[in-house]
């Protein structure tokens, strides 16, 4: 009996090690930067934005287009500027991403944000991050960085950027990346454990 208990404990420990070893952080592939297509390639100037929309509550009221301005830091292969509609003094840029199959406690987003003119907050699933970008040339000539590491949901998550334009052209840009640990398949750990137990019992009989 004691040997069986020890064997079970050893199998359980080995199974946990197996599951831990297979828990690796991977990119969140449903999170996109502004101004790119589904493959991550930059959209052409004037093209409709594919992953961010401007909302006033729900539903969406405007699809931004890829834009450019000589005063802005240039768009590149990773992201592009998207426009604020003429006459809008404020707008909420919104995107969603899916954490189905991931451990939400392990998720983390790295966001590089620029805006013309200001960001008053960034919300993850309606919860404030306390992040803001103040009015001034640095707002659209350099990046402001934000890391989000909590308030995630299993399934679809909503990310919102609250922007204000103080006159003239308005635009927004974000380079977004993230990673999370995929949820381990319990069946793999169980099969691994059963295999160890069978091997141990076989050796015990032979002995």
What is each model feature region?
Residues 26-80, 96-100, 148-181:
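Accessory carbohydrate-binding/adhesion or oligomerization-edge regions at the termini
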Residues 79-92, 132-139:
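Extracellular beta-rich ligand/substrate-recognition surface
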Residues 87-101, 144:
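Short beta-strands within extracellular/lumenal beta-sheet-rich domains
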